[in-house]
Amino acid sequence: YLSELAGGKKKKESIFDAFKVFKDFKNYLGNAYLHFSEPIDLDTFLTNNVNENYSIDSPQEKPEWLESATGMLGDEVIRSINNSVAVTSTSLFSIALLTSTTQTMSEDDLIERINFFLTLIKDSSDYGQVWVTQTDIKGIISKTEKLGFISPTLIGSNKVYRPSSDEVATLSFYKNNISHLFILYSLICESVKFIRQVPKDEIIRLIEMIYPIFAKDFHLKTEKISQREIENAMQTLIQKGILNDEQENFIKAPEEDNFYYSNYIALSNLCEPSLKRFYIVMNAMWKSEAISKDDLKLKCKELAEHLEQIEGWPYPEFSDQAKFDNFVYAMKKTKYFKEDDLGNLSASIITKRAKNLYEQFFDKDFLDFIENQAN
């Protein structure tokens, strides 16, 4: 798993893999948390998504609706799991550390950052009731160390946390478990990162447009988002000093010397890799009238490999066939892509019209790089 997360090739599993973990039982294993989400009534689900007369008369029968209904049910299960996630110590530690631009933090800075993420959960209208398994911040850090996920370095009398590449891959698994709790905040922060100030209504329009693909990607509660939900999230960020609304009906990022600037950047960093992946794909689509899925994957993979050399972080979605297939499926479901009878893909008209809005998420260097590599 760690190899795949770092961009390596997918490895086959073996029956003998289970025996390799026996040595871990002598170590501290922490806690396992079991949390139940809302039950899904299958009869109601099929009635609503197929029709009242759905039926399968034998195990060999595969009606036309079965594949799509199974996919929708899978999405519903994952959404339910995410909505009832247990926020563990390791997840909080991981998201606090890995959203730092340098992925290096002192203990004091880490304590402040974990507390910031805890308050965002508490104030969230969607996820305020999720189970946070531990709120003592020093205990959160101590437990992550005890589990062996990271060892601090002492610089003078201060603890500094600087994970190795293997530790980053491990911690990323735990970070990803709770990233969805903060993705709306992250998108709002990213929308004002490269522009001096932005009208509130433009931010709302941009988030409404991009939200469906993130809802699919992160299995969020709903596939679409309302203006009120965006405004509430925006207001939460303003109250915490993460955004500035000094000028009426305009939003801007805090100044670099502002106390809250590092928290603002941490939130922005959370959605940035997914946004870049989205733009890499969309840029390839905009430059093609129609393109096969294999050709699209090849173009994106080549471009991402060049980007990896600059950024130092992989884009495994373009090297893993299953991940890429899932991504294309999500883009079709959210109507960003159209597919013709030959299986070729094309960008929907609305995405072409919104290209300038999407570019608001990125700095000029990234946009120039994508444009030059694509030509």
Feature-to-residue mapping (PLM):
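Membrane-interfacial terminal anchoring regions of lipid-handling membrane enzymes
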Residues: Y1-N375
